[in-house]
């Protein structure tokens, strides 16, 4: 099957572990989920045929859950428990670790200067964003009013883009979240946590942008 003309967001939802593969190639399948595989590969100067071959292997495995067919209230409940609650745990811990690493290793050339600041900004933005979803948008969708939620959904998508931009800054100052040889245990643990947080946030945004919001607007 040719995957190159399909949107990244669709591929991430229909092929097991495709999201992890896209993350490996630094391809944005959440905020940039509407771009085709061919377009995304071209922008990164990647060989689309190689990625297609890897996707073909992954596609042989069964999909654990196809959220495209799930009831909208079930998707919302899953998002809150799997992603919102998790982000609320992850970010305060990462901020504490970043504060320590920046203080203890201030004289090291590879220290991620500004990481605490940008993690704090992400935490503040996501906290406000998730609260608005849980208090305003999600209840509207659960009440069958998704088709009238174009305004709130547009705002949420814009905030997703802003979160994506912060992730790019965080990846830049951490050298794509790669610990240097001199990194201590806390430093390494923090980078592991940041990678996990980025994976979770990209999956979270993808599920909303590519499944929940379009279906809600379409009254499905």
Curated annotation (Swiss-Prot):
Molecular function terms, GO-annotated: metal ion binding
Keyword Metal-binding: yes
Pfam families noted in UniProt: Hemerythrin, ScdA_N
GO BP terms, alphabetized: protein repair; response to nitrosative stress; response to oxidative stress
A GO cellular component entry from the record: cytoplasm
Top-rank taxon, per record: Bacteria
Keywords of the record: Cytoplasm, Iron, Metal-binding, Stress response
Subcellular location: Cytoplasm
Function: Di-iron-containing protein involved in the repair of iron-sulfur clusters damaged by oxidative and nitrosative stress conditions.
Subunit architecture: Homodimer.
Similarity remark: Belongs to the RIC family. YtfE subfamily.
Name of the protein in its database record: Iron-sulfur cluster repair protein YtfE
Taxonomic source organism: Klebsiella pneumoniae (strain 342)
């Amino acid at each position: 099957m040719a995957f190159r003309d399909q949107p990244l967001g669709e591929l991430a939802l229909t092929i097991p572990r495709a999201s992890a593969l896209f993350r490996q190639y630094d391809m944005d399948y959440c905020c940039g989920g509407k771009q085709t595989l061919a377009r995304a590969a071209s922008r990164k100067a990647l060989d689309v045929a190689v990625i297609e071959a890897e996707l073909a292997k992954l596609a042989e495995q069964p999909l654990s859950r196809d959220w495209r067919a799930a009831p909208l209230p079930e998707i919302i409940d899953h998002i809150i428990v799997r992603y919102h609650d998790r982000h609320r745990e992850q970010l305060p811990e990462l901020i504490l670790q970043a504060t320590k690493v920046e203080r203890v290793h201030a004289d090291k050339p590879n220290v991620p200067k500004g990481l605490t600041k940008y993690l704090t900004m992400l935490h503040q933005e996501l906290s406000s964003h998730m609260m608005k979803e849980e208090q305003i948008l999600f209840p509207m969708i659960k009440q069958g009013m998704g088709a009238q939620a174009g305004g709130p959904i547009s705002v949420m998508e814009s905030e997703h883009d802003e979160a994506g931009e912060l992730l790019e800054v965080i990846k830049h100052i951490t050298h794509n979240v790669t610990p240097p040889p001199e990194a201590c245990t806390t430093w390494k643990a923090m980078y592991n946590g940041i990678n996990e947080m980025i994976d979770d946030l990209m999956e979270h945004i993808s599920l909303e942008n590519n499944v929940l919001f379009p279906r809600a607007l379409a009254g499905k």
